[in-house]
Amino acid sequence: PVQLVMATPPWRLVGSGRLPATEARRKALFGDKGTFPLFASAASSLLEEDGRFVCIISPDRLQDMLAALDGAGLTPYLLQYIHKQKTSPATFVLIEARKGAHAKPSVAEPIALYGQERFFTLESLAFCPFLR
């Protein structure tokens, strides 16, 4: 068993949106209703008790992922919304779930990636120094 599993599951549903030019990109970005349960189940089988599963998805699929986590015995622990700019809708949601936990999830302060001049914000650089 491991303490941490990280993933970026394909969150777009097949048949929605514009398809990428390559098959590899299509597989990376598009899945079906069974994709999230597969990822959650695989993560759960790899994790030790109280291990963490962290993933990033589109906010419009949040309910689907929460249901998949519940079905795999993973409890959402932390949600954090990622915005392109402070005034724009969330582009992504970062989810941390724990195996066998019974805590209520908390919502962290949202992160805005870009400021007015399209440069990374200090908060986004603090969150991910690799953006420098």
Task: Give names to the regions the model predicted.
Residues 32-94:
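Conserved Class I SAM-dependent methyltransferase catalytic core
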Residues 12, 30-31, 83, 108, ...:
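Generic, ordered loop/turn and secondary-structure boundary motif
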Residues 8-11, 59, 101:
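Short, flexible active-site-adjacent loop segments at beta-strand->alpha-helix junctions, enriched
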Residues 29-33, 78-81, 102-106, 119-120:
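Glycine-rich loops and low-complexity Gly/Arg-rich segments
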Residues 2-4, 9-38:
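Mobile active-site "lid"/loop adjacent to the S-adenosyl-L-methionine
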Residues 89-132:
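SAM/dcSAM-binding transferase cores
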